[in-house]
């Protein structure tokens, strides 16, 4: 089984069309990886599906980097 970090990076790569090697934990979805608002919504939906959780909108707005996504998943499993 892949680690949460690996799974999050794979989702980010697939959703944003970025190579996994280019993604760091500090990568900002918008500033570093070129995501727009629709991309971030789709990214949150993909995270919800992968980790079988629901991320409330007010929490989703706070998830702006790869590390924040990892931290959210870890704390809500």
Swiss-Prot record:
It is found in: Cytoplasm. Residues 2-77 form the Carrier domain. Keywords: Cytoplasm, Fatty acid biosynthesis, Fatty acid metabolism, Lipid biosynthesis, Lipid metabolism, Phosphopantetheine, Phosphoprotein. Disulfide bonds: none annotated. 4'-phosphopantetheine is transferred from CoA to a specific serine of apo-ACP by AcpS. This modification is essential for activity because fatty acids are bound in thioester linkage to the sulfhydryl of the prosthetic group. GO terms for cellular component: cytosol; membrane. GO terms for molecular function: acyl binding; acyl carrier activity. PROSITE patterns: CARRIER (PS50075), PHOSPHOPANTETHEINE (PS00012). Pathway: Lipid metabolism; fatty acid biosynthesis. GO terms for biological process: lipid A biosynthetic process. InterPro entries: ACP, ACP-like_sf, PP-bd_ACP, Ppantetheine_attach_site. It holds the Pfam family PP-binding. The modification O-(pantetheine 4'-phosphoryl)serine is found at residue 37. NCBIfam families: acyl_carrier, PRK00982.1-2, PRK00982.1-3, PRK00982.1-4, PRK00982.1-5. PANTHER family: ACYL CARRIER PROTEIN, CARRIER DOMAIN-CONTAINING PROTEIN. Carrier of the growing fatty acid chain in fatty acid biosynthesis. Belongs to the acyl carrier protein (ACP) family. This is Acyl carrier protein. It comes from Oceanospirillum linum. The lineage of its organism: Bacteria, Pseudomonadati, Pseudomonadota, Gammaproteobacteria, Oceanospirillales.
